[in-house]
From Swiss-Prot:
Pfam families: DUF2045. This is Uncharacterized protein KIAA0930 homolog. It comes from the Eukaryota. Residues 254-335 are annotated as: Disordered.
Length: 399
């Protein structure tokens, strides 16, 4: 299936270069409807989901200035035995994009790896602790700081969520001089190919700067407004931007209490032959001049990008052409000169009072350990597709 898609994309590119016109619309509809019917409606594996996803593009409405507005895009979901399935060749269905969406949601497996690493003076990356978890692609999302909220369509951005992140990454702590690294790998069901679709990292110093700023600001506000009666669990959600701004990952960050037992110093950690001390030295590109003190594999910029439309309805989505602009551009440095640009999302719940947490925070040492729990990774559909079909970068953390 993937080979057929690659061949068709190459054929369209060659034809466009020769004629300058590209393929006729009817030719494209015939091919992509055939692909959809053959690989998703007919070839159904026993363990495969019985859902079908369609990308519908509704006619654009005329704007107030008389110009035609942008077409609205919706994702429709049906069971395979539904009598309401759109007819093959329906002109309002984007069949090419529907094939891509079903491919990413149903034909691929995904493994995310979160690791605590350090960088040597020679530029090598040493992995001290890592945890891999299977995740699933979804065209919808829900807030990770509250349970039971209704999911919302996020397409064309695909989410890979870890709902039980506190359990999965329970012993993932980061300290001074370390960094948290994230890698998401896609592979087909037969394991004939695999490719990295997301890589990113954040240094402890940058993570702690954001965390301390948010907790102290929230504590000061609560001290004035609640007289210390407001209960607060000091967990903050920080976003990690991918390379070249491609998608982002979210980390749930909280302080390790002094009574907790550090995962470091165990028998496994002290063994030089342990996988915990795996050394990674392979990097595809040299560090850029701006980041000559860190491998270019990592993209530590954390300034958050903000969705363009916060009030979109559940079934509405941004068009795939907008996926690169789904968030506003941000600076490409990793030093967090302006922490206030990051949106603060605090997890409210039971625990010690906010004021007490803030006072304790000010009394603790500067380099306290932090829990760093990966909550999700999100990427635009077309960027995932490009990495799968064209790039196929080899994993580093999973190697």
């Amino acid at each position: 299936m993937i080979s057929a898609i690659v061949d068709e994309r190459n054929r369209m590119n060659i034809r466009q270069e020769i004629s300058g016109l590209g393929c006729f619309k009817d030719d494209r509809i015939v091919f992509w409807t055939w692909m959809y019917s053959t690989y998703f409606m007919e070839k159904w594996a026993p363990r495969q989901d019985d859902m079908l996803f369609y990308v519908r593009r509704k006619p654009a409405y005329m704007g107030p200035d008389g110009n035609e507005g942008r077409k609205q895009v919706e994702v429709e979901v049906y069971r395979k035995d539904s009598k309401k399935l759109p007819g093959l060749g329906d002109p309002d269905i984007d069949w090419e994009e529907s094939v891509y969406l079903n491919l990413i949601l149903q034909k691929l497996d995904y493994m995310v790896t979160c690791a605590v690493c350090t960088r040597s003076d020679a530029g090598d990356i040493h992995i001290h602790k890592k945890k891999s978890q299977q995740v699933f692609a979804s065209p919808s999302k829900h807030p990770m700081d509250s349970k039971g909220e209704e999911s919302k369509i996020s397409y064309p951005n695909i989410f890979f969520m870890i709902d039980n992140f506190e359990e999965v990454f329970s012993d993932m702590t980061v300290g001074e001089g370390e960094m948290v690294c994230v890698e998401l790998v896609a592979r087909d069901k037969t394991n004939t190919f695999q490719g990295v679709i997301f890589q990113g990292s954040i240094r402890y110093e940058a993570l702690k700067k954001v965390y301390d700023n948010r907790v102290s600001v929230a504590a000061k506000m609560a001290q004035k407004m609640s007289f210390g009666f407001y209960k607060y669990n000091n967990m903050e959600f920080v976003r990690m931007k991918g390379p070249q701004g491609k998608g982002h990952a979210e980390m749930a960050v909280s302080r390790v209490s002094t009574g907790d037992t550090s995962p470091y110093g165990t028998e496994e950690d002290s063994n030089p032959g342990s996988p915990m001390h795996e050394r990674v030295t392979s990097f595809s590109t040299p560090p850029t001049p701006e980041r000559n003190n860190r491998p270019s594999f990592f993209s530590p910029s954390l300034k958050r990008k903000v969705p363009r439309n916060r009030n979109a309805e559940m079934k509405k989505s941004h068009s795939a052409n907008d996926s690169e602009e789904f968030f506003r551009d941000s600076d490409d440095d990793g030093d967090l000169h302006n922490v206030t640009n990051l949106r603060s999302r605090s997890l409210s719940g039971t625990g010690r009072s906010l004021v007490g947490s803030w006072l304790k925070l000010n009394r603790t040492e500067e380099n306290a350990l932090l829990y760093a729990h990966l909550t999700y990774v999100t990427l635009p559909l077309l960027r995932i597709l490009s990495d799968i079909l064209d790039v196929r970068q080899k994993p580093i953390l999973m190697s």
